[in-house]
Amino acid sequence: LVVWSIVLARIDANHSRLPNGLTVPPALVALAACVASPYLAWGLAWPAAYLVGPGMGGGDVKLAAPLGVLLAALGGPFAVLAAVGLAGLLTVVRGWMAGRAALPHGPQMLAAAWAVGTFVGLKSSIAATL
C-alpha cells in the first residue's frame, strides 16, 4: 500500500492524472467488499461526495472508493468523514500556498487516508491494551 500510494501521489502531482491501471482494480475490489459487507458501504461516501460537486476528476472518484472502504473497515463512518474533511483542507491549504485554485487532489487524499488510518490504528491499539 505504501508503494502504491507513493506512485499514485507522484504521478498525480507531476501529471494531474491518476492512471486507470492503478485506480480501477482497487475500486472494483472496494465495490466487491461493499457487497460482501454492507457496513463497508460507508466507505462509498467519499467517492459519492466527489460526484456531487465540480472540480474532481474521475481518477479522484476511483481513488476515493478503495480509500473510503479501507477507512470504513478501520474506523467506520467517522474515519471516512474525517479523511474527506482533512483531504479537502489539505487541498485548500496547498492551493493557497501554491497561489492557484486548480491542482491535483490525489496526493492530499492519500495523505489524509494515511493520517486518519494511522490515527485510528493507534487508537485501536491503545484501547486494546487498556
Residue ranges and their predicted role:
Residues 3-92, 125-130:
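Functional transmembrane core segments of multi-pass inner-membrane proteins
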Residues 33-36, 97, 118-119:
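Helix-loop junctions at the membrane-solvent interface of multi-pass transporters
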Residues 93-116:
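Interfacial loop-to-transmembrane junctions
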